[in-house]
Amino acid sequence: MYSIKKQFLFLFLFLLPLKLFPDEKEPIIQLRVLAHHIAHKIVHAAVEDCVKRGYLVSAAVVDRNGNLAAFLRNPLSGVHTIKVSKQKAFSSATLRTKTSEIAPRRSDLSFAPDILLIVGGVPINFTGNFYGGVGVAGARPDIDELCALAGIEAVSEIMEFVD
């Protein structure tokens, strides 16, 4: 009996500090990812906004790592808009800023693979969380950016209340 109490006491005293003094850093990093239906709403709203402005475009959404999450092409838009919209989205996501803000400052990045420094790529941020990027191609570059912003705006009300 005495031996069991002694062993229990030893284990208790040995394990107690582990609970009282946990590591300062969390062992898990939590990331937020756009649900597929939100990514689809963004590209749909971006393409529709450009149609209202009189332009036929493609729109792409990529996740935080630059992987394609959603894509929509107006059937009458040029075939080149497929690749260009993806590259604009990739550029804004991986550099985490609008392509319109990168281009004047970082021409050296024009040689990086899949980076396209043409206006029309916008990062997707809500409530301080980064989700990825959206790129639009087929209109004038300044209009592409406005349509990308319209795509983000279309889901902003939903995303503002995400916990």
Language model: regions and residue ranges:
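Hydrophobic h-region of N-terminal signal peptides that target proteins for export
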Residues: 13-21
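General helical structural elements
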Residues: 9-10, 92
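Bacterial N-terminal signal peptides that target proteins for export
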Residues: 1-9
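Flexible, solvent-exposed loop/hinge segments and secondary-structure transition points
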Residues: 23-163
